[in-house]
Regions:
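Residue-level detector of anion-binding/catalytic polar loops
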Residues: 29-30, 55, 107, 178, ...
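Short catalytic-loop micro-motif centered on adjacent basic/acidic residues
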Residues: 29-35, 180-182, 280
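Flexible loop residues that form catalytic
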Residues: 36, 62-64, 114, 248, ...
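Short glycine-enriched loops at secondary-structure junctions
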Residues: 7-11, 60-67, 114-116
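Histidine-acidic metal/acid-base catalytic patches
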Residues: 1-24, 39, 50-52, 96-110, ...
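N-terminal substrate-binding region of glycoside hydrolase catalytic domains
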Residues: 20-41, 71
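Glycine-rich, proline-tolerant flexible connector loops at the mouths of alpha/beta enzymes
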Residues: 33-55, 119-120
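Active-site acidic/histidine proton-transfer and metal-coordination neighborhood
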Residues: 79-210
Length: 310
């Protein structure tokens, strides 16, 4: 299934139906309702869904956006927060997202699990890489500092994330809605790759919990030498619930249209299951012309016509 994320155009619309119609003009008939969606857009999307104008593959947490948050901020509340009330708010909003998915007969929600409260080093690594210093002593020093600091303090936050998951998976399981734990772009975010593997093992008897592969996020880590994209996909293949599709221009400019950056989609898609949602998740800065040209190339390579999604 090929779908298109509403993150591309939700911020410029005041009517959900108009938002959907703009996506239809690109050739997509299925959407992922993304985070940052104003609650005022839901009636129009519901109308489009009920009139069979659009299909909804899934929903990205938090959806709709919390009314008290005036910008698109999917990490405004985290399962890993030191503040109990914020952890509870994150859980409650996630349960609301599951309810949103139920309204549209959607099959999944995408989750961010949280972050490790530490000084952000990933941006420094990206700046060094951008200036061709990815093999310098300064780079290795910052990278090792990041890895050691994170490893030391991470366990508490993993346990908080698991505690939150345990609370929301009951509702998800009752309604057969998959919880896709998303790969993140910054190493300070949670989970990292070792933790993701551990989580998949921990929830191996819980069918609704799985891995959500974000091509752009993983490529950014690949560009920093934190992992190998191809090897990681091979390892996670049995757990993949779906993918976010976007490209990356060296080393960290993500949410570009496919084939405009460094990702070798032709090779990597050999590791992707055939029966999962593939969601185009693009920056609002991407133009219709860019998207249509990219989509044409996509269809020619993968023999996929998005207008014939089922």
């Amino acid at each position: 299934m090929i779908a298109f994320s509403t993150c591309w155009n939700s911020q410029k619309h005041s009517d959900g139906l108009a938002m959907v119609e703009e996506i239809l003009e690109l050739g997509f008939d299925t959407v992922e309702i993304s985070h940052g969606l104003k609650v005022s857009l839901l009636p129009g999307i519901i109308r489009a869904f009920e009139e069979k104008i659009i299909k909804v593959a899934g929903v990205h947490n938090f959806c709709p956006s919390p009314v008290e948050v005036l910008i698109d901020a999917p990490d405004c509340y985290e399962f890993t927060s030191h503040r109990e009330r914020e952890r509870k708010r994150a859980i409650d909003l996630t349960l609301t997202t599951i309810k949103t998915a139920e309204k549209f007969n959607a099959k999944y929600i995408v989750l961010h699990l949280g972050s490790i409260p530490m000084k952000r080093i990933s941006p420094k690594l990206e700046k060094l890489a951008l200036n061709d210093k990815g093999e310098s002593k300064a780079y290795e020093k910052q990278k090792n500092k990041l890895l050691k600091k994170r490893q030391k303090i991470a366990p508490l936050y993993i346990e908080r994330a698991k505690s939150a998951l345990d609370k929301v998976l009951i509702e998800a399981s009752e309604n057969s809605i998959n919880l896709g734990i998303e790969s993140r772009s910054a190493y300070e975010d949670l989970p990292n790759e070792e933790e993701m593997i551990s989580l998949m093992k921990h929830y191996e008897d819980t069918p609704v919990v799985g891995y959500w592969h974000d091509f752009g996020h993983i490529q950014r880590k690949h560009n920093l030498g934190l992992l190998d994209h191809d090897e990681w996909l091979s390892k996670m293949n049995p757990h993949i619930k779906g993918c976010h599709l976007h490209d990356v221009k060296w080393p960290h400019r993500d949410h570009q249209v496919p084939f405009s950056g460094d990702i070798n989609f032709t090779e990597l898609f050999k590791k992707i299951p055939n029966d999962i949602p593939i969601v185009w998740e693009l920056s609002h800065r991407r133009t219709k012309k860019e998207i249509l040209e990219s989509l044409s190339k996509w269809n020619s390579i993968f023999n996929t016509n998005v207008e014939k999604n089922t």
